[in-house]
Amino acid sequence: MIDLSPLVRRLAGTPLASWSQGLQAQLEAKLEKGHGDLDRWRGALQALPTLQPSEIDLVNGLRLDCDCDDATRAQMRQALMGLSPWRKGPFDLFGVHVDTEWHSDWKWSRVSPHLNLKGKRVLDVGCGNGYYQWRMLGAGADMVIGVDPNWLFFCQFQAVQQYLPELPAWHLPFALEDLPANLEGFDTVFSMGVFYHRRSPIEHLLALKDCLVKGGELVLETLVIEGDENQVLVPEDRYAQMRNVWYLPSVPALARWLRRAGFSDVRCVDVSVTSVEEQRSTEWMRYQSLGDFLDPNDHSKTLEGLPAPRRATLLARK
């Protein structure tokens, strides 16, 4: 059983205290429903060797290390491989380099210089396997809660968390919709790589705003197109072979949507075209990746003939 009492204690005396009281029951109800592969993934977690990190680096990447022999390292590698595919990372765990599909460290290096997370209570919506949560702690966050309903990501987070049990990071297998309205308890809320999957983008922005304290900051990272404030791409069917992509606004259009949703001090801090070096298939993620979804003769377009993935990060204040 995953014991959330440390989280409840951490949130005592904060605006999130009453919400925290029901989290254990909510988590156990989710675990009871579970997933067909959950037992297999739990087996991989149980196969991880018992180690105590003597070196922890969450600032320059995500690296844990200690003196361990080749057999222990091989055991670590096999157990982690049992949690494939690994999408966000990379992780360096006791000499095992988990070469994930995404170079999430590149994105973090673009975004983090614009943030001040020191002492902040942070929510990461659609947190994936928690890679960014650890980096947020490395940047000085007081605590980080991540929510993502994907069970494999939940187990991947547990794989790292079992070596960092004292650090104030928690992964809840919840969707944003599972959080109560008007939480108003987080200093910073992240939504990275989620917005374009939402059928109702303004509703998503309002739900994110609900999670923030007054004066809190939203960090929104999403797919965009070039153009003015009236330009928005709505794919006819698929985008880069994804069926669940709904809205790709221009940066000025997205800024307007944020203002319309009641945010202020809206600013874009980064725009970058995603390269096939930043997102690609690896030994740890053997399925198709970005290179398979672009026009082979023109990487500025997707297979559908639409503009290739371009991502922007906008900051806004409640």
Curated annotation (Swiss-Prot):
InterPro entries the UniProt entry points to: CmoB, Mo5U34_MeTrfas-like, SAM-dependent_MTases_sf
Cited Pfam families: Methyltransf_9 (PF08003)
tRNA processing among keywords: yes
E.C. number: 2.5.1.-
One GO term of the biological process aspect: tRNA wobble uridine modification
Catalytic activity, reaction form: carboxy-S-adenosyl-L-methionine + 5-hydroxyuridine(34) in tRNA = 5-carboxymethoxyuridine(34) in tRNA + S-adenosyl-L-homocysteine + H(+)
EC top class, as a word: transferase
Keywords: Transferase, tRNA processing
Positions contributing to carboxy-S-adenosyl-L-methionine binding: 88, 102, 107, 126, 176-177, 192, 196, 311
GO molecular function: methyltransferase activity; transferase activity, transferring alkyl or aryl (other than methyl) groups
Subunit structure: Homotetramer.
Recorded family membership: Belongs to the class I-like SAM-binding methyltransferase superfamily. CmoB family.
Role: Catalyzes carboxymethyl transfer from carboxy-S-adenosyl-L-methionine (Cx-SAM) to 5-hydroxyuridine (ho5U) to form 5-carboxymethoxyuridine (cmo5U) at position 34 in tRNAs.
Identification of the protein by name: tRNA U34 carboxymethyltransferase
Source species: Pseudomonas putida (strain GB-1)
